[in-house]
Curated annotation (Swiss-Prot):
GO terms for cellular component: plasma membrane; proton-transporting ATP synthase complex. InterPro entries: ATP_synth_F0_asu, ATP_synth_F0_asu_AS, ATP_synth_F0_asu_bact/mt, F0_ATP_A_sf. It comes from Sinorhizobium medicae (strain WSM419) (Ensifer medicae). It is a multi-pass membrane protein. The chain crosses the membrane at residues 26-46, 84-104, 114-134, 143-163, 193-213, 216-236. The lineage of its organism: Bacteria, Pseudomonadati, Pseudomonadota, Alphaproteobacteria, Hyphomicrobiales. Pfam families: ATP-synt_A. Key component of the proton channel; it plays a direct role in the translocation of protons across the membrane. Keywords: ATP synthesis, Cell inner membrane, Cell membrane, CF(0), Hydrogen ion transport, Ion transport, Membrane, Transmembrane, Transmembrane helix, Transport. SUPFAM superfamilies: F1F0 ATP synthase subunit A. The keyword Cell division does not apply. This is ATP synthase subunit a. The gene is atpB.
Length: 250
């Protein structure tokens, strides 16, 4: 099982909890989701609780993260979209922290679970729909009627727009899930090559050099992917929120 590259994604029960025939067990995925929230919140608290006129390096990282998301949201959804800053910032920090924790050996990568990423995506799209109808009423439906479309093509275009909108949770969740899953499997495969070849003595160790180099290179790449996937999720969230704030802008 240790050589199985997919073994690292298995969800295992830590505490079995059954209520009315429904499984509410506390699993390793639950544990690392709690750890992710705790790590992100702890980092932000420790780096901002005693802010100085001259920021420390960690305080600078927190302030840069704040400005990074604030700028992204202003560009993506305008000044009116800033009311969603806590939501977008929390999503970005959760995904980034979860991705980085997943890079630690023997830690569980919660963003490699489609149920987790899909829940985050549904939360985003649900917020867009609820706020869109709350703010604009049925005017929110203008989102599905692009400007300048000939009347004869309007039914087809509206149908395409609705299907495209409803597919957003799928594309948003699968993008994050698939990238994290594929990256960790690839790392495991190359690390397995290193371990297997090293067992054959000096000759095997010589042959393990190339897989070792690839493993180190892929590890660096995965750290970059960890940030990029959190960034992409946040950018797309800002774009979708713009549809709720300005439904008739396209």
């Amino acid at each position: 099982m240790s050589n199985d590259p997919t073994h690292q994604f298995l969800v295992n029960k830590i505490v079995s909890i059954d209520i009315g025939g429904i499984d509410f067990s506390f699993t390793n995925a639950s544990l690392f989701m709690v750890a992710t929230v705790g790590a992100a919140a702890g980092f932000l608290y420790l780096t901002t609780s005693q802010r100085g006129l001259i920021p420390t390096r960690m305080q600078s990282v927190s302030e840069m993260s704040y400005e990074f998301i604030a700028s992204m949201l202003r560009e993506g959804a305008g000044s009116q979209g800033m009311k969603f800053f806590p939501m977008v910032f929390s999503l970005f920090m959760f995904i980034l922290t979860a991705n980085l924790l997943g890079m630690v050996p023997y830690f569980f990568t919660v963003t490699s679970q489609i149920i987790v990423t899909f829940a985050l995506a549904v939360f985003v799209i649900g917020t867009v729909i609820l706020y869109g109808f709350y703010k604009h009423g049925f005017g929110f439906l203008k989102l599905f009627v692009p400007h300048g479309v000939p009347g004869a093509l309007l039914p087809l275009v509206v149908a395409i727009e609705i299907i495209s909108f409803l597919s957003r949770p799928i594309s948003l969740s699968v993008r994050l899930f698939a990238n994290m899953l594929a990256g960790h499997i690839t790392l495991k495969v190359f690390a397995g090559f290193v371990a297997s070849l090293s067992a054959f003595g000096a000759l095997g160790i010589g042959g393990a050099i190339l897989p070792l180099i690839m493993t180190v290179a892929l590890t660096g790449l995965e750290f970059l992917v960890a940030f990029l996937q959190a960034y992409v999720f946040a950018v797309l969230t800002c774009m979708y929120l713009n549809d709720a704030v300005h439904p008739g802008s396209h």
